[in-house]
Each structure stands twice: as structure tokens, then as C-alpha cells.
Amino acid sequence: METQLSVQLGLDSLLTDFGLESVMNKQQQLFANMGLSDIGAPTPSTAIPVPNAHLHPSMVAGSDPSNPVVGFGFGSPSSTTSSSPPLSNSPTIEQQQHAQLTAMMQGIMSNNNVAVSNGSGVQVASVPAVHCSGCKSNETATSFCQDCNANLCDNCTMAHKFMHCFADHRVVSLTTPGTGSSSSSTSSSSSASSTSSHQVPSLGGKQSPDSMMLGSGKRSVLCLQHRASELVFFCVSCNLAICRDCTVSDHPSGTHQYELIADVADKQMLKMEQLIADARSKHADMLDMFKQVDNKQQVLTASLHNAHAQLEETVSNLINVIQDQKKTLAKDIDNAFAAKQIQLTMVDKRIQSMADKLSQTIEFSRRLMSFASPAEVMVFKQLLDTRLQLFLGFNPDTSGVLMTPCEIEYLGAAGLFNNSASTVSQLLGSVHGGSPINNAPAANDFLMPQAGLAPIGRAQSRIIPIEQNQLARSPPHHIAGSLPMNAYSDSNLLRPNKDFGGSSQSLGPFNPLGASVPGAAADPFSSQYDKWSLGVEPSVGGLLEGGNVDEEKFQTLFPPSRSQIKRQKMIYHCKFGEFGVMEGQFTEPSGVAVNGQGDIVVADTNNHRIQVFDKEGRFKFQFGECGKRDGQLLYPNRVAVNRTTGDFVVTERSPTHQIQVYNQYGQFLRKFGANILQHPRGVCVDSKGRIIVVECKVMRVIIFDMFGNILQKFSCSRYLEFPNGVCTNDKNEILISDNRAHCIKVFSYEGQYLRQIGGEGVTNYPIGVGINSLGEVVVADNHNNFNLTVFSQDGTMIGALESRVKHAQCFDVALVDDGSVVLASKDYRLYLYRFLPATSGQSTSSASSQI
């Protein structure tokens, strides 16, 4: 395949060689399929000028499939009707014939028999005759106009010869078969000249491409500007091939340097080869860069998803921090309200008591003055004078409660909302797009509020300044002067010294980086709002407010932090349960107890039933169904067992808030307490069969007998914050776990507050309490891990354990006589942990192992 440059194609012809070669190969294959091999190919001695269309390939005689097409010229067509001269010579006649055959494929004639003749009048082949398409006469066509693409009759052919509108049209004559006559290919500008059978018709009277072949066999190339001149020079100054005429007109020797093409061709081609090699190298580099761009695009896309995920996580964590802080502030508001309410209640009681006494005295004096004799009046005069003088001098508001404002003022950080956008952006961090940003906050800036910036919702006075690298709990004297203790009054401060309960008082956030528990330092959100509390005696209240406390006295007020307690690891030896409504499945196992045979009793709240398992976790039986009738349960939340009779005692939360009693086989016995109880939270049965119920929200303890009669009830609102578990010992003492006070409160059956066991840093957020077979107090909490802390009856810590498996949230726990504890978790499973060696003795110190 050779390429001839032309004005029409230009440089694009170099870029389309392979496409045209493919076209020619397809045409050659098509010729073979259409039967040209049966007709025969034209010989080189026969020139066949054929029009562009309307001829079937089978009309050409002499086709030979063994004679392949060897080339095709892409310059000016080498035919007698060419309107422009060629730029180069054709090396072979086969290329000329192939071009003519290609022109034949543009149209197929049918229905008439005509023959195509060459310029010398030689009949090539007979074809069906066609009619004139240039006029309406419908006469037989005798010629074909390539420019009009129409078959012409004799009249139309004559018009093409003499009319100016058809000037320069290329007309090819057609002869009827059998006549043997022929007409030459004509042009309107000049009559067609016949040629010999071995010649190719001239192109417009100019030299044919075959005559332009050089003697050496090389092709000559004509100048694009001077069409008759051959390119023989190369202008080095202009980097352009020129002819002799160009050296005179456009490239004079004085200003342009040019040489013969034969002399500089090799050197210039070497330069071109070097440029091509450089281009190949550049192309390879561009391919590598394309791969790099693709890799960068993939990395960029991955980083986009990662950045969005991190942003969502940061926002979620920030929302959680705000929610936790909201709960803390809500608790502070409730504490402030409770303290103020208790102060007003005490003043109210004193006023009411004094008013009753004064009313009685006035009534007695009136009746004395009305019905007694003067002598009798004089007998009581001194007494009445003294009593009335005391009444007149009585001041019920000795603490000035009525003189101080009673409103609860929330000191929100209102100034932060003026620049809330910048504040939130600092908390959320910034975006790095691959280049360093000068104003990006440091990594540690996110862990602590900036100087002078209080946490959201906190007043500036409650910020506790600490050092950035202070990871341990700060000594008490560091914060004694900075905490306004009077901002968090507790009800215990208003009681006499003998009644003071010493419950933990929430003092708000400690230090942002004071991680006192393992893993807290790794969480920047939880560490910023780490809570600490302090059991305060009234005798030291003034010292705390004054801030003049030495370190030794102050350290005695702090319970040991969690990091100072070495807890032994324990693992569970049994696990059972899953989510569902079938046997052995739970939707909310919120209460658990153990009977005298070691069976595990579970209150499945949302399934409205009680399930009983053996100590290996195998299902035994169940009772209860949803409803309010006898034998039906509605949201049972706690369960206890009477060790003497084996009866089950079940408490229900709202809307029924009552107690139901079933025998050991699950048969209904009785129910009571619906009009008495409000928010039952914990229940146990002591050794004498008395039912002790502790209520949250109203902070009340009610003692029933097994038939529902009230034996005792008393309020614990001054001591409890959020009770969630209860048990008794053999000393007629009631032990109540307080989740928010982080300790165990001990009361007598008459409601007298006795003592506290545990405290924050030791029993954080307890979920239950019980007495084991050795008479020891076992406190369970769910802070970070599932923890067990063992105390003596007087509050001395004996041991501490923690689970190897982290339990996110737990409902309830119960003790087993073999030294195990049953844990009801919010993952719908029950776990059995063994924390004491197995003992054969039964519990003698408590009738309840309920935690």
C-alpha cells in the first residue's frame, strides 16, 4: 500500500493509510465473492476507463483472483476525466486498474444491456441497457456523466458537449451490445482523443503518471505551488521541500539556505527518526502519567468516602457528648430544685407546727378567759405569758430561705452563640486537601476547650484549669478553691448531724483529661466530661467553701479512684438466651432471681412472662401472658423468690405498677399494691417472708407481708437519687443500691438511715446488691466492664473483680449459693460468673440473694 500526498488529503492522508487499506482489502474480498474470478481480470495492456457508478463488477472481463491488487493511489485519480493533475506517478498499471474497479462499485446498472468501452473503442463487456436519466425521453442511454451522476441519451450527450452549463463535465460513452462500435470518453472542454490499447488515457491533456516515472525507478514529487516543477531542493531555513521556481520567488539564495534533497535527505531523516524516538519516549511517559492520574483518582475517591465517614463519626460523637452533658446539666438542675424544695419544705413544716401550737394556745386562752374564774386564770397566766412570748419571738426562716431568690437560673454560655459557627468548626476539626494548612488546629486542641472557652452549657466559673499533660486525677487541693460548693446544695446539709447520710454529691465535671479509668484517655469525648463526686460531712462544708483545707484532711474525703483498685479477672462459665419470643428467648430480660434449688428465674418484660431455667441454663417452664386478668402479666420488670415457700413475687411497671404472687409451679395466687405503688424498681423477700419494694422517682420503701398488707413504709428522698436494687441481711437492715449516688445506702426497717457502703471510684453506677452465703455484701456495677466488689457488713472492702468480656449495658444480677452470679444483659443473654469457691452451705445470713 503506497500513499500519495495531495492537496485534498494533505497530512491527514498519512493518518488514514491503515483505514483505507482495510477498505481495499474488504473490496477485494467482495469482488471475489461476487464472481469476478469467473470473468477474468483485465490485463495490463488494456486500459479501462470506467465511470464511478452503475457498473456491476461482473461486467468486467478478464478478472483473475490470482492477480491481487497491489496498490491504490490516494492522490488525484488517474483517469481521463480527472480535473486536477496528479502529484506523483503510479508505479504499476495494477494500481490504475484497482482504482477503476473501485469506481465501478459505486453503482450497479440493471434492466438494460449496454457495454463499456475503453478510449480506443475496444468493447470490454456487455451489460444490461439503461435508459436516460438526464431527461424524460426514456431513451436508451449512450453515455454517462460522472459529474451529474446520470445516464445520458444522444440528445443529452450533445447538450453536454456544447452547453456552457455542462462545461468540464466528464462524460463516458456507452455502446449497445452487438454493434461493436464505440464512442470515446469526451469532455465538454475538448473532444476525447483515442489512445492505444496499451496506454492509459491522458488526464486533461497532461502527462500521465506512468510517464513521470524516473529512470532510476524513484517517483518524482511535484511542487504544490508550482504544479509543473519537481521538488529537488530542501530549504534548511524554512524546513520545507522546494522546487527550482521556489528558489527564485520565495526562497532566494541570499536569505535562505537550501540544498539538494538527495544530499540532505539522510541527515534530515535521522533527525526525524530521533524526533520519533523522543516522541515514543514522551508517549510512554504520558501513559505512565495516565496511570498515575488513575491511581490518584482512586486514592482521591477513597479519601472522599473516608473523610465523610470520619466527619459523620465526629459529629455523632459530638452529639453524644452534648447529650451526655445535657443529662448532667438536667441532673444539676434537678439537684438544685430538690435542695431548694427541701429547704422550703422544712420551713413549711416549722411554720405549720408552730402555727398549730399557737392555734391551740390561743384557743386554750380564749376558753380559759371565757369559762374560768379569775383565780384560775391567774394560775395559768405565767405559763401563757411565757408561751405566747415564745410564739411572738419565733422565726421559722432562720436560714433566710424566704429572703433569697427561689428561681433556678440556668447560666448558659450565651456568648458562644454569637460565634457558634466558628466554635462548632473548631470542635469538628478541619479539612486538609493534601497541602499543609497554616491555621489548622493541632491534634491536642480538639481534646481540650480553648483558653477562656467553657464547655457547652457550662458557666465559666465551673471550668477547672489543668495542665495538658495531667492524665491522672488531680489532687483535691488543686480544685478546692475553684469549685463553688454552694452551687450544689444537698438535702443532707439541711439535716441535723446525727441524721446526715453522707451520700455522694455530684459536683459536675472534673478535669477534661483526668482519665481515672482504663481506656478513658483514649476517648476524647468521654474524658472531657468525666464525673467525680464527694461524700461531704456538714462539719467540713464550711471548710470546702472557704477553700482553706490542707491536703491530708481533704484526701480523706475522696474515695479511692478506680485506677487504684486492683481487680481480678473473671470469666463466665455459662451463657444462654437470645432474642425472640420462643422458649429460652427474650426481648427484655430486665429482672433475674435465683430460688432455693438454684434455678434461675427471669422476668421477660416485653414478652409478658416469667421463664425458669436450671443452673445450667436449660429451660424448665414458663408462666404468664399479656393481660390484666388473674394469671396474666403486663410488663413484669423485677422478680424475687420466697426461699421458704418457693413462691415467685413479681412486680409490674406502669400502667399496672402492682405485685403478683405465684407459687413454685407458676400458678397464680394473688396480686396487690396497684393503688399504693407508683414506680416499683427493686424487690426482695427477707427470711420472714416480708416483701420489700423500693420505688424510684418517689424514693420510697414499702414493706408488705405475703398477703399484701402494708407493714411499713417510709420516704428516702433525702438519701436516694436513683435506686435500682434492694436486699436484706439478718440484722433487719435494708440495703439499697443507688445508681446515681454510686454507693449502697443502708436503712433500718423503720426507715432510719444507717450508713453507706462503697462510693464513687469503687462502685460506679451500681446495678444491684446482694448478700452471699458468707454474709458478705456483693455490689455489681456496669462501669466500663461488669464489676463485682465485695464488702463486709460494716463497709470494708474485701475484694474486687471484673469481667474479661465487656458488657455494654446490663439489666439485673442475682447471686447463686455456689458462689456464682447471674447477669442479665441487654444483648438478650444471661451470663453466669463464678467469683467464689463452691460452697455447700446454704445462705443463713439472708433470706434473699436478690441483687
Swiss-Prot record:
Q: Does the keyword Hydrolase apply?
A: no
What does the tissue specificity note say?
A: Present in cells in which nucleoli are absent, and absent from large cells in which nucleoli are prominent. Highly expressed in the gonads.
Q: Where is this region: Disordered?
A: 71-91, 176-211
Q: Record-annotated residues binding Zn(2+) 2? A: 223, 226, 246, 251
**Gene Ontology CC annotation, any one:** cytoplasm
Coiled-coil stretches noted in the UniProt entry, renumbered to this chain: 303-331
Q: Which residues bind Zn(2+) 1?
A: 132, 135, 156, 160
Q: What induces it?
A: Negatively regulated by the let-7 microRNA.
> Biological process GO terms, please?
negative regulation of ribosome biogenesis; negative regulation of transcription by RNA polymerase I; negative regulation of transcription by RNA polymerase III; negative regulation of translation; nucleologenesis; protein localization to cell cortex; regulation of establishment of cell polarity; ribosome biogenesis
Q: Where is the composition biased (Low complexity)?
A: 76-91, 176-197
Note the Gene3D superfamilies from the entry: 4.10.830.40, Classic Zinc Finger (3.30.160.60), TolB, C-terminal domain (2.120.10.30)
Q: What is this protein called?
A: B-box type zinc finger protein ncl-1
Organism annotation: Caenorhabditis elegans
What broad taxonomic lineage does this protein's source fall under? Answer: Eukaryota, Metazoa, Ecdysozoa, Nematoda, Chromadorea
Give the gene that encodes this protein: ncl-1
